[in-house]
C-alpha cells in the first residue's frame, strides 16, 4: 500500500523535505510508519517520541482526522492515506 507522510515545522527541517512516501504492508499502524520514518532520519525520533510513545505535543492526522478520534497511534493505514504530523506551537 502506498501512503504519504507530511511533516511541518522543525520536523520538516530534520526530514529535509515536506513529504515522505512509503510502501507499507496491510495492517501497518501510524505508530509503526512514524517509527520507520524516524529510523531513516537522525534526530526525528527524539522529536516524535518520548519513552517510546508518541509525544502528546504532536498532532497526527490521517486523511484530515486526528488519530485520537480513530484508534490513536494504533490506527491502521489504508492505501493512499495522507498522514500529517505537526508539532504543537509553544511559547510564552
List each language-model region with its residue ranges.
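Ubiquitin-like/PB1-type beta-grasp interaction modules and other compact soluble beta-rich domains
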Residues: 1-91
